[in-house]
Amino acid sequence: MLLLADMDVVNQLVAGGQFRVVKEPLGFVKVLQWVFAIFAFATCGSYSGELQLSVDCANKTESDLSIEVEFEYPFRLHQVYFDAPTCRGGTTKVFLVGDYSSSAEFFVTVAVFAFLYSMGALATYIFLQNKYRENNKGPMLDFLATAVFAFMWLVSSSAWAKGLSDVKMATDPENIIKEMPVCRQTGNTCKELRDPVTSGLNTSVVFGFLNLVLWVGNLWFVFKETGWAAPFLRAPPGAPEKQPAPGDAYGDAGYGQGPGGYGPQDSYGPQGGYQPDYGQPAGSGGSGYGPQGDYGQQGYGPQGAPTSFSNQM
């Protein structure tokens, strides 16, 4: 019963989740940040390496032709030592040089917290979208946290890149041999047999700077969610329409009044078109609807009738 109740809760969460956010840049980049953070702290925090060298004494019975030195994260090399022959009937402890734990641990810590934050932010995007956008506090806090992590990735990746360079120098068998007194004695021969494999550590630095790119790039997508970019994204106002000048369209050189009008002269002017002569008799004579003689003197009025009141007077 308890298992069924738990499954119901899970089903409700899944049903109420907004998984489409994973397809959007804001959520998709968070998934990449989550994955790349895992690679960053896994390749660095789980590292262990080994180097091998040999000491061939003049007295062959005291030689040690296979000295193996192991070291691992967090690279406190000053605590790593191995037994080397003195070629005088005994052995001595030889310690490596350097403590590079601070840069390595700082890098891994940033990666772990980035992993946790990415997972929490992604869960908030999916299941608590309304709470995330309430009062716009979620996007603003998300933007500030993203900016902080971007800066931390820059610092930690740069510090760890320098620390890794120092680790390589400190674990180089040739440099170790130079510091061994027995190797400076005449008749003794010291050789390096195997260098430590540091490809995993190189990968951790690459993932560190990839995380930096992801977090810096994600700043823009989170910034758009805050609404602070709205004033910058607003469309500029359109150009005002040009008002026609008085007399330009319907003025002195108006519609059909001359070369500035819209039609040929005499289209609707006083010299053409329908201009009845109210001085004619009841029939539309003179220059009415048709040419003279069509509806004029042979039309409705009698022939020989006066054509205007002026003729009668």
UniProtKB/Swiss-Prot annotation:
Skewed-composition ranges (Low complexity): 264-281
Gly residues composition-biased segments: 253-263, 282-302
Keywords: Calcium, Cytoplasmic vesicle, Disease variant, Glycoprotein, Intellectual disability, Membrane, Phosphoprotein, Repeat, Synapse, Synaptosome, Transmembrane, Transmembrane helix, Ubl conjugation
Domain annotation MARVEL: ranges: 21-227
Topological domains annotated Cytoplasmic: 1-25, 131-137, 224-313
UniProt-annotated stretches for the region Repeats, Gly-rich: 254-305
Molecular function GO terms recorded: cholesterol binding; identical protein binding; SH2 domain binding
GO terms classed as biological process: endocytosis; regulation of long-term neuronal synaptic plasticity; regulation of neuronal synaptic plasticity; regulation of opioid receptor signaling pathway; regulation of short-term neuronal synaptic plasticity; regulation of synaptic vesicle priming; synaptic vesicle maturation; synaptic vesicle membrane organization
Localization in the cell: Cytoplasmic vesicle, Secretory vesicle, Synaptic vesicle membrane; Synapse, Synaptosome
Topology of this chain in the membrane: Multi-pass membrane protein
Disulfide bonds: none
Annotated tissue distribution: Expressed in the brain, with expression in the hippocampus, the neuropil in the dentate gyrus, where expression is higher in the outer half of the molecular layer than in the inner half, and in the neuropil of CA4 and CA3. Expressed in the putamen (at protein level).
Associated disease: Intellectual developmental disorder, X-linked 96: A disorder characterized by significantly below average general intellectual functioning associated with impairments in adaptive behavior and manifested during the developmental period.
Subunit structure: Homohexamer or homotetramer. Interacts with SRCIN1. Interacts with VAMP2; the interaction is inhibited by interaction of VAPM2 with SEPT8.
Name listed for the protein in its UniProt record: Synaptophysin
Lineage: Eukaryota, Metazoa, Chordata, Craniata, Vertebrata
